[in-house]
Amino acid sequence: GARGRPRTVSDSPVPIDVFTSEDLRAVSYTDTNDILKTLVPSFNLGRQPISDGSSFIRPAELRGLPTDKTLVLVNSKRRHRSALVSIGGSGTQGPDISTIPSIALKNIEVLRDGASAQYGSDAIAGVINFILKDADDGFSVSIDSGEFSEGDGAQTTVQANLGLPLGESGFINISAEISEADATSRSEQYCESWFCADPNGASPYNIRSGQNGGDAAFLAGLPSANIGQDSAVVQPWGQPNAEAARFFFNAGYQIDADTEAYAFGNISESESDGGFFYRYPGNGTIEDLRESDGGIYNPLEKYPGGFTPRFFGEVSDFSLLGGIRGSFDNGLNYDFSGRTGESEIRYTLANTINPSQGRASQQSFKPGDLINSETQFQADFNYEFESSFASPVLLAFGASYMDESYEVVQGELNSYVAGPHATPDPFGFCNADMTATTAGMNVIAGGSTLDCANTDDPVYQVVGVGSNGFPGFSPQFSEKYERSSTALFADVSADITDNLFLQGALRYEDYSDFDAETVVKLAGLYRFTDNFAIRGSIGTGFRAPTPGQQGTINVSTRLPNGFPVATGLFPAGGPVAQALGATPLTPETSTNYTIGFTANIAELDLTVDFYRINLDDATYAISTRDVSTDPTSGDAYQNFLLLDNAGVAGANSIGGVLYFTNGFDVSSEGVDIVASYPLNWDSAGSTNLSMALSYNKKAFESDPSAFRNEEAQFDYVNYNPNWRGVFTAAHDINDLRLTARASYWGEHENANSGTSRRQVQDPTWYVDLEAQYQINDTFRIAAGGRNVFDEYPDKGNVGDTCCGRLYESGSVLDWNGSYWFARLTADF
């Protein structure tokens, strides 16, 4: 909470969780994101299949607010953002926490309070600080392997950590992680009457294409529809295939008694792939086309059963930070640092076509890359003044300069180019009066079935442009958005009396692309006794729109009412979005209130903290504006004209337009309760009981109806459970540790505008069990299961589980079932 002076959890004026490496090791996950989800109930994390890049970099939330409202630090220094801007919802762009191997961590500090006045943009919901290991000796290696009870999703992770001395007074600590995970599928066959017919007219639709199904033609085409997955399901819903190699280092060298040089950084490479929506025979993408020789071509020649595009994402992440810290003779402490970081996503789309190119279309495309880069230089100082208070007054102050950029890199030509079939009669076979031209008569003479008088003839068929599922970034919309910012900040704190601690912070930050922001914070703790204290804070905060949110553009497949349509996202400051009413993005601003208490009652440690966050001018994507080439479709046709006039390639294949906007005001309020209690059983060992319980409620504080439809409004407030709890019992006896953990997810609801129906999801408990045994000083084994009772959330029943989907796949509840694992660790 206070710069320059560490404080314990119980005497901090704001709520802080500190998890040691032992705490992290007691969690069965190795992914740092999942570890946080397990330990911090106000940290929610879902899995989003068929969601473009969000399938590979999972956005999270803290205290009911998206991931970009939480500041991420490594060794108390700002972590760079990922290159992913989530297209829907809040358009969140935060750091990719999964690039930090859990074995590299000495501890994790979670500040559950606004801290923009101390750390700058993004620290609205809180701050997560990852502290790296700094041992100068020792070697540890572990291998973890497991599989879901459904028989899929096999995962293997190998981690290692090595500590070495650096000269006579330094260290270098190196961590590595290599992992591989197979895909899962929690789907039923995607089968509808218009493409999965039942010749007997009697079988239920869900067995028409099963092992005993009756549609032989559909079954015969399945192997070509979905490459790389179970060919019996044309559209799998589950986690993607994934593999990764990640490395982190942390180093320090004591130059003299008062001066230390330090550095840390990482390299991470990962690749994932998952499916998109199934294009069934008869879908608008799969149409008869009249080719240049007068013959008819249909994509079913390449894909007899239709096709499911396969989306690949290669994610590269790099960072390097160096600095020097120490103290001057006058007692002024300093810390000078510089950092650079970059995240890049390279996309590949396979098992698809550019429909407008007809028979000439390739089947695999490189639609382009996304790159986020940051460079920052910072100077921190702190000084203690003697005072008449119970402690010296600590003054911390400093300055920062940061450059940021976001680049959309052009895709390969065929991923975005408009082929001949983007326009009717591309080869000039027919006259305006619907008679054959000379070219038309020539192909008819050669045996073509061309009939210019028939409006249904394939010569007039128009199909979509670009690699279907994720059209490439064209030169027109491939650009680099850059900005810089400077900041000045100060923080003062002191124990006013033996019982009262007060802290104040002030920050001024100026951005090159919008006006400056000034934010403040006040916090305090009053200790009534050694065992009981109250604490609270009030502060203002802000989150600057990222260069990615301001500059990104994307056209991808969405499913607003159960059917795939191409949806275009355009920059709020660009001409297309502004023609529809958009204005350039401005910072989100916030006011945070927290009040709570800490208590130590006998062996019981208890903290209770109430909070409220008011967020003004929240960044959100508008509800999709329909687009149609039909002149009778009113506003939808006007939107098409705007796109077409702006020169958007393939405007005729776009079904909707959205953009980010500062749309409305929201609030997030709740309570966090954390408790622990140890039990000693003498010769029978000891048990530590812990509980972390979180309640969160979100609400709109201004009318969002101009930007969000009824379903989006309902889901924003109700989609995630209000209550979430984690209850853990860890029993140690001799060399054996037994851990039982129960995770609770409260009742919640979701709606579907296509059916105007709402579904209540019942409360759900997941139970994890694990046993660890220390074989000797070197080897330790562990085995157990997550969700051992194989619980699932309720199946969807309001019409938004189209296309073989059984569960609300965007839910924060896991829907993959039970997972069983074993782990071997060696410490040298």
Please identify what each model-predicted range represents.
Residues 8, 16, 36-81:
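Extracytoplasmic beta-strand/coil segments of soluble accessory domains associated
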